[in-house]
Each structure stands twice: as C-alpha cells, then as structure tokens.
C-alpha cells in the first residue's frame, strides 16, 4: 500500500478511535454500525464541552488570579546545602500571586512577590496592544513606569546582532549563534508589529473567530461518515475472553478493513466534499481572508496526487472492536496489515468486574512505541490502583523478578481519581510516579541501586479542578521524606484593576538614555531590602548577594542602599 495513503488513513482512524476510547454501548451488528454510533455520541459530548468552553473563556478574559508557590522542606534545604555554600535554613517558600486580564487592545498584570509569606515587592506589567507599548513598574523601587516600544526594541536588538556579526566577520570569526539569532528574527512572525496586533486581537476575541458548537458537530459527523462509508465489514469472529489481572469479559470481535483502493476513494471524497463545504469556507474566512484560498490550493494539489494509479498488493488497514454480551465496546485496535507483517498502531482496552477495572493503551510497535497498563478498584466513584508506563519491549515479570538488561518504565499509583467529576469536565485526583528499583536481574541490589539513583524518589501529583478554579501540586519525596513542592492555583472571574495608559504619569522611555539615567537615579532599595530581612533572610547573606562577595564583607554604606540619601 502506498505509504502516503497508509499513514494518512491510519492517522484518521487512530484519531477517531481516540475519540471513542471509552466503554461505550452499541447494538452489535457490524463494525461500522458499532463505531459510527460510538463516534456520534463522542462527538456530541465533545460539542457540548466545546460550547461550555466559550462561557469559561469569558470568565478567563474578565480576570484570573494565579498563585505559583515553590516550597522547600527540611530535607530539601539540607540537600541543597550540599551544593550551595550559603545558609538556606531560613527559606521556606517563595510565591508569585498575580491578577491577569485581557482586552482586545490591552493586557494587564499586577503581581505580588512573597517570601516566607512576607511581601517583598509588587510587579506591574501592562501591554498597550494598540500602540505596541509595554509599561512596567516596581513601586517599591520607584513610582515611575518604564516604557518599552515593542517595535523599537526589536529594531535595536536586530541592530546589535548585525553589529556583532560585522565585527566578527572583520576579525575573521564567525558566530553561528549570532547568524541563527538574526535568521530567527527575520523569519519570525512575531518580528512583525502588525502580526502581533492581529494575533493578540485573535486571542482576546477567540469566540468570534471560532465556529459554533453545532457547526463543529455537523462537520465532524460529515467527514467521519465518509470514512465509515469506505470501511468494509468482515464477518464477526467467534467469541474471545479478555482476561487480565484476574478480570475477564467474554466478547465478540467485529472487524472493519480499509484497502488501498478504498483509502484512495475515501480521501478523494473527503477532498471533493471539502471543496464545496460552505461551513469550512465560512470558518476559514473568519480567521483570515487568504486562508481559504490557501486551503483550496492545498486541496487542488492533493486531488492531483490522488489521481495516481495505485497497485493493490493486498495490504490493508484493519480496525477491530471487542463487544460484550451487553453491547459494551471494551477494546479497540488498529493495525497496518502488510503483505509480510502486521504493524500495530493503536490498542486500547478497559474491562471491568464489579468494582474492579483493568485498562491498557499501547501506541506503535512494541519495540518502538509505548504501553501503559494496570488495574484498580472503584469505590464510591473513586478509582485507586497501579499502572505501569513502558517504552519499547520492556516486559517485567513481578513474580519471577525477571527483567531485561535495561528497563525503561514508570510506575503510576493512582491514589484517588474521581470518575464522576471527569464526566463534567473537571479533574480531581492524586497520583505518585516512581521508577523501578531493579535495572538488571543479574546485578546485586547494591549495583542496581548505584545504576538507578532515582529508585528512591517519588513524584507526587495532586489535581483538583472545577469549572471556575483549579489547583495543581507537584512534590518530590526521597525514601518517603518530602523535599519540596511546586503548587499552581487559579481562580476565574477575578476583577483586575486596569489603568488608562493616557493617565499614567512619570513614564520613562527605555530607548531614551537620559530618561533611563533619571529613572535609575531615583531608585531606592530600602523597602525591598527591609522586606527581605523581615522574611527571614540573614543580613549577611543579603549583603553577600548585593556585593557578590563573602558574608564577612562590610555592610553597604547608606548612600549605596539609598541613592537619594547620597544626593
């Protein structure tokens, strides 16, 4: 089978199977009837979530509050103490607490920086998208704003790079890094001020450019129907028992195949339908005036390529569905069946026995792709269990302890996954990620430990999200002792103070040397330094950081701490 057609149709089928990767109910008559009914349900659910996302976007646009916190525990501070010759026993956490909002012509962010729950300073960042001007301020340093003209800053950076390049060429030296940076600037769309304006306008008015949920649902159903029209059903095979981890279900296998000529016919119909698809035309024209024209040119080129006569060598794509007696689809697979080999593309399975569940997913050939499999128990809609993620052919026999010379896998313990919340688009769960302690069955425990320094570490992930808020926490433990964590939380619909750019006073142009000298002359560090000391930072360490010297150096004189005092 022609490689282009095999890959394109396999990707199309895999994407559709991915949408239906859930235990679905279907009246079992043929593969196409089963999977088309399942896909229609999946598309309907997707369209509902898509429509709901527009409401969430409005809340996001009005304002969002974010907290990002890095915490070090006692063991983490002790570990870092081996690498850094400074006292960090006083440090507990650092946090950035920000309020962010977007409008068509502006972005606003006001953030507080905290250390050990003590506020150190405030960061203000405003982006005037209409004039492409950025305003920044740290009021604890100085009340005035630094203004950066986006276009002028790009031109200045480009001029510096060009000057460096000319200087190196004169001296006979060539800097590949400088050449790459220049080429990147010239080719980047973000170097074009007009593109920046249009891009930000698109982001802040996203719902206006995107199709309605009903339109999206219609388009997805239209083109998936074309695919199923070209899949040939084979007779259902005898029943097969899926038995994993003591969980078993008896199923009937239904198969659909797509030959080389069928794949070509499918792609031709997709192209021909897309050429006259008014809904696609409306969507693309809403995004960009020239996008639909480019799309039609691409369809024309594809149509010409599809007119090539293909030799049918008997190879085909095979898709299978395992259906239980109560018409649940519990397994799906997709393979490329060549004349001399069968290449796995996708295999998903989920079988249950009362409150027990086994699930697996594999992508690609066994020696090249990845596989994840495991089992757990659902109680009160909460799933707990263990899954193993493997790359390549890395089979591990837990009973015999036999492992290959090199094992690449991660154990995933699911401690509490809310199976009800996810149906409403919310994610709630607690997970831990570990690495195998055995690298080689022939090696001693000491050798295994030496070859796998990560065996004693665990990554702990906690997710708790609702429609208007969310929190993600990632922590690291060693031998069960916490080292530290990163926590990110957000709340939608927060009111953000939005200044009028025309009303901003005491503005200093970053491109004006005299203005910047005036700005620097009025900076005072008193407030920030006092806040750092109040947070618990030792004064000796503070002086060391300021001077770049040692903790034994003398304290800075008053005039260096406060330039205004010197004047």
Positions of PLM-derived features:
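Bacterial N-terminal signal peptides that target proteins for export
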Residues: 2-11
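Cytosolic-facing loops and C-terminal tails of multi-pass membrane proteins
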Residues: 2, 21, 372-374
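C-terminal segment of classical bacterial N-terminal signal peptides
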Residues: 18-26
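Hydrophobic helical h-region of N-terminal Sec-dependent signal peptides
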Residues: 13-17
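Subset-of-secretome marker
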Residues: 27-567
């Amino acid at each position: 089978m022609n490689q282009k057609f095999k890959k394109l149709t396999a990707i199309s089928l895999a994407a559709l199977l991915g949408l239906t990767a859930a235990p679905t109910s279907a009246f079992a008559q043929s593969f196409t009837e089963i999977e088309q009914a399942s896909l229609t349900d999946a598309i309907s659910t997707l369209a509902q979530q898509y429509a709901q996302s527009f409401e969430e976007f409005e809340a996001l646009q009005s304002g969002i509050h974010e907290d990002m916190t890095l915490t070090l525990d006692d063991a983490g501070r002790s570990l870092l103490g081996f690498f850094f010759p400074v006292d960090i026993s006083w440090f507990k956490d650092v946090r950035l607490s920000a309020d962010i909002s977007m409008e068509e012509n502006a972005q606003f962010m006001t953030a507080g920086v905290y250390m050990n729950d003590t506020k150190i300073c405030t960061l203000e960042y405003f982006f005037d998208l209409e004039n492409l001007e950025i305003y920044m301020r740290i009021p604890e340093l100085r009340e005035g704003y630094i203004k950066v003209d986006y276009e002028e800053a790009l031109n200045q950076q480009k001029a510096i790079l060009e000057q460096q390049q000319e200087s190196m060429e004169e001296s006979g030296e060539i800097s590949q890094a400088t050449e790459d940076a220049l080429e990147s600037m010239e080719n980047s769309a973000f170097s074009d001020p007009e593109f920046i304006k249009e891009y930000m306008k698109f982001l802040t008015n996203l719902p206006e450019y995107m199709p309605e949920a009903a339109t999206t649902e219609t388009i997805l159903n239209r083109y998936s129907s074309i695919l199923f029209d070209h899949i040939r059903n084979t007779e259902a095979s005898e029943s097969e028992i899926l038995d994993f981890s003591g969980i078993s279900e008896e199923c009937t296998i239904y198969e659909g195949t797509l030959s080389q000529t069928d794949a070509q016919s499918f792609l031709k119909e997709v192209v021909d339908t897309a050429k006259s698809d008014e809904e696609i035309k409306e969507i693309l024209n809403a995004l960009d005036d020239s996008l639909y024209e480019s799309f039609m040119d691409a369809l024309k080129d594809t149509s010409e390529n599809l007119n090539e006569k293909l030799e049918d060598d008997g190879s085909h794509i095979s898709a299978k569905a395992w259906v239980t007696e109560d018409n649940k689809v519990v397994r799906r697979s997709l393979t490329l069946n060549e004349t001399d080999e069968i290449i796995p593309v996708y295999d998903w399975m989920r079988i249950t026995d009362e409150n027990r569940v086994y699930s697996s997913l594999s992508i690609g050939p066994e020696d090249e792709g990845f596989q994840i499999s495991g089992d757990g128990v659902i109680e009160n809609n909460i799933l707990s269990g263990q899954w193993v993620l493997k790359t390549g052919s890395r089979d591990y026999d837990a009973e015999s302890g036999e492992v290959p010379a090199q094992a690449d896998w991660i154990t995933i313990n699911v401690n509490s996954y809310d199976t009800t919340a996810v149906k409403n688009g919310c994610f709630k769960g607690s997970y831990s990620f570990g690495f195998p302690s055995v690298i080689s069955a022939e090696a001693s425990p000491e050798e295994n430990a030496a070859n796998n320094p990560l065996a004693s570490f665990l990554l702990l992930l906690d997710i708790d999200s609702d429609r208007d808020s969310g929190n993600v926490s990632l922590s690291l433990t060693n031998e069960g002792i916490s080292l530290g964590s990163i926590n990110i939380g957000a709340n939608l619909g927060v009111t953000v103070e939005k200044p009028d750019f025309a009303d901003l006073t005491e503005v200093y142009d970053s491109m004006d040397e005299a203005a910047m000298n005036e700005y620097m002359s009025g900076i005072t560090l008193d407030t920030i330094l006092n806040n750092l000391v109040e947070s618990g930072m030792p004064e000796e360490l503070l002086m060391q950081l300021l001077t770049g010297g040692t903790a034994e150096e003398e304290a800075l004189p008053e005039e260096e701490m406060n330039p205004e005092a010197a004047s």
